[in-house]
Amino acid sequence: MVCIPCIVIPVLLWVYKKFLEPYIYPLISPFVSRMWPRKAIRETNDKNKGKVDYKGADINGLPTRGPTEMCDKKKD
């Protein structure tokens, strides 16, 4: 036996997607695009694209820029 929310939630999502979204989305999309602006994607023609310099790698393996230092003291 299937629980009631397992039936009702997909039906409500289908009704929203099929009938309500075409009317609601044009009203909401200008606000969403202001909140989450798209950033331009730049393609680089770098010859060293696959090579990574591991000298400045952080503890978790992510490359960092500039010197990294660990402070044990709190700064007030």
Swiss-Prot record:
InterPro entries, per the entry: UPF0729_C18orf32-like
Function statement: May activate the NF-kappa-B signaling pathway.
Biased composition, class Basic and acidic residues, residue ranges: 47-56
Protein keywords: Endoplasmic reticulum, Lipid droplet
A Pfam family it matches: DUF4512
Top-level taxon in the UniProt lineage: Eukaryota
Modified how: Undergoes ER-associated degradation (ERAD).
Region (Necessary for its localzation to the endoplasmic reticulum and lipid droplets): 1-37
Region (Disordered) location: 47-76
Protein name per the record: UPF0729 protein C18orf32 homolog
